[in-house]
């Protein structure tokens, strides 16, 4: 069962993270600016509770996550630019243009995985730094 938790700012992040950690075996945090700026709050709650956090992107994973299927903001921007060119040149109709996806990179946070005693499957790259 998946449960959604919401917070409006960094002031609520601590209590919401605590509630989520208390009620779940693992957490998924999508790409979110508030979490990205406050990964220490999430890590300070989830790691001592032995609750793995799976992150929506590498920056959050580096701060509080165990693993991510990370997007490349460069690749995403490049693909978006290519789509914009097609629209501006009249080669595509924005209302019928299909959504395009970029590849993801499998990455993990060795320190947190080690602290939680997790073995990472083959095919994941260690997050540097």
Question: What is the meaning of each model-derived region?
Answer:
Residues 1-10:
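Short beta-strand elements in bilobed, periplasmic/extracellular small-molecule ligand-binding domains
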Residues 9-12, 32-36, 59-62:
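Solvent-exposed loop/turn segments at secondary-structure junctions
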Residues 12-26:
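Short, well-structured alpha-helical segments in soluble
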Residues 13-15, 61-70:
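Glycine-rich, charge-decorated loop segments at or immediately adjacent to ligand/cofactor-binding or catalytic sites
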Residues 38, 42-65:
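Venus flytrap/periplasmic-binding-protein-like
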Residues 71-92:
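Hydrophobic alpha-helical segments within soluble ligand-binding/sensing domains
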Residues 86-129:
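Hinge/cleft segment of the Venus flytrap/periplasmic-binding protein
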